[in-house]
Swiss-Prot record:
Keywords: ATP-binding, DNA-binding, Nucleotide-binding, Phosphoprotein, Repressor, Transcription, Transcription regulation, Two-component regulatory system. This is Luminescence regulatory protein LuxO. The lineage of its organism: Bacteria, Pseudomonadati, Pseudomonadota, Gammaproteobacteria, Vibrionales. Residues 1-112 form the Response regulatory domain. Disulfide bonds: none annotated. GO terms for biological process: phosphorelay signal transduction system; positive regulation of DNA-templated transcription. Changing D4K: Constitutive luminescence. Residues 133-362 form the Sigma-54 factor interaction domain. ATP binds at residues 161-168, 224-233. PROSITE patterns: RESPONSE_REGULATORY, SIGMA54_INTERACT_2, SIGMA54_INTERACT_3, SIGMA54_INTERACT_4.
């Protein structure tokens, strides 16, 4: 931490101590640069105003010698334009002083997590952020915590989420983090297998059990012995087979199709659906007793549109992988493409993002993804809707009228809150540039300070 005011440095140290972070505090830019000769930090918190040089000078020096070290600027209200400029030169983020404890912790935690992810990907090509996942949004942090807590248990996990959110990736993450990680992970898609074959796929069959059964065959249950059995799109399973599945879950035993012998296996059940499982129970399409057997630990995967900055993290990770695979040289997205990605709803979630990027990489060349390369519907003008929604009174009176700046302030503050503090994303929804929001925040903060004097 580069902060020349001792009391502020001590306060911020107390905020970050619960994270278990080792913090080295220096008071000048020269000391900060010199300290890099002895120890390279995971993150630098840098004040813009220092007694011997500017924060921008320190930024340039650090980026020249250690370009991979992430830097977060801390700035007073009057220095926001400088902070925005600093981000253009390599700063990862900036915080407005005075900074609240929660905001500081989240920003620092995210920056360290992202830096660790990038380092791991450089050391181990193809390695992802967390057990195959990419993303550090608060919604995904909750998913990671649930996986960490539940992985070691044998309790059944029921994953819900829209199509394309990564339910199988989640199931694989649970398996990899469990004590069964070195045992088989067997997935069966209940929606992709014909009704008359799914029992055989699940439990296996003996020779002659039905037309075409020329040999004995192991099913998914037997193949998963000792490991994890993942039942994807479980709510598509026929009710008759649900009865047999319930018995299998209760006893750990099953019969192959055409056999009278019982087989016993030890499997951990993970299942998933893109429907509401309880609604399926209420409408008679899913057995209630099976629901209670499997719905022990619910785990909901958020849609991509609710994951904030994860969209761009995922996009960059996929771009690097696909460019290498297709022999292309793409390395970045144009700013208007980033804004389009952030404002788009992504009804097909991560799977749609994968398809969009594959289309772009295969059909185009260059180093930068530009707006004209986007396929439909992303190449169409975006009709934006304000994230901030106001309830209009039926009849407005003079007393209901607010100053225009106050209405604007409410809209911006609500948009920032809805976007989890992501100002560039909020700006995209409001159809203004991020710098416009920063300037307005600066003006309102100055107004508040004058009123408090």
């Amino acid at each position: 931490m580069v902060e020349d005011t001792a009391s502020v440095a001590a306060l911020y140290r107390s905020y970050l101590t619960p994270l278990g972070i080792d913090i080295n505090i220096v008071g000048t830019g020269r000391d900060a640069i010199e300290s890099l000769n002895h120890r390279i930090p995971d993150l630098i918190l840098l004040d813009l105003r220092l007694p011997d040089m500017t924060g921008m000078d320190v930024l340039h020096a650090v980026k020249k010698s250690h370009p991979d070290v992430p830097i977060i600027f801390m700035t007073a209200h009057g220095s926001i334009d400088t902070a925005v400029e600093a981000m253009r030169h390599g700063s990862q983020d900036f915080l407005i002083k005075p900074c609240e404890a929660d905001r500081l912790r989240v920003t620092v935690n995210n920056a360290i997590r992202k830096a660790t992810k990038l380092k791991n990907e450089a050391d181990n090509p193809g390695n992802q952020n967390y057990q195959g996942f990419i993303g550090s949004s608060q919604t995904m942090q909750q998913v990671y915590r649930t996986i960490d807590s539940a992985a070691s248990s044998k309790a059944s996990i029921f994953i819900t989420g829209e199509s394309g959110t990564g339910k199988e990736v989640c199931a694989e993450a649970i398996h990899a983090a469990s004590k069964r990680g070195d045992k088989p992970f067997i997935a069966i898609n209940c929606a992709a297998i014909p009704k008359d074959l799914i029992e055989s796929e699940l439990f296996g069959h003996v020779k002659g059990a039905f037309t075409g059964a020329a040999n004995d065959r192991q099913g998914a249950a037997e193949l998963a012995d000792g490991g994890t059995l993942f039942l994807d799109e479980l709510c598509e399973m026929d009710l008759d087979l649900q009865t047999k599945l319930l018995r299998f879950i209760q006893t750990g035993t099953f019969q192959k199709v055409g056999s009278s012998k019982m087989k016993s296996v030890d499997v951990r059940f993970v299942c998933a659906t893109n429907r509401d499982p309880w609604k399926e129970v209420q409408e008679g399409r899913f057995r209630e007793d099976l629901y209670y057997r499997l719905y022990v630990i619910p785990l909901h995967l958020p849609p991509l549109r609710e994951r904030g900055k994860d969209v761009i993290e995922i996009a960059y990770s996929l771009l690097g992988y696909m460019s290498h695979e297709e022999g292309k040289s793409f390395v970045r997205f144009a700013q208007d493409v980033i804004e389009r990605f952030n404002s788009y709803e992504w009804p097909g979630n991560v799977r749609q993002l994968q398809n969009v990027l594959r289309n772009i990489v295969v059909l185009n060349n260059g180093k930068e993804i530009t707006l004209d390369m986007l396929p439909p519907p992303l190449n169409q003008p975006v009709v934006r809707q304000s994230v901030a929604k106001f309830i209009e009174p039926d009849i407005m009176t003079v007393s209901d009228i607010m100053p225009l700046w106050m209405t604007e302030k409410m809209a911006i503050e609500q948009a920032i809150q809805a976007c989890e503090g992501n100002i560039p994303r909020a700006a995209g929804y409001l159809d203004v540039s991020p710098s416009t929001i920063y300037r307005k925040l600066q003006a309102w903060n100055s107004k508040d300070e004058k009123q408090n004097v």
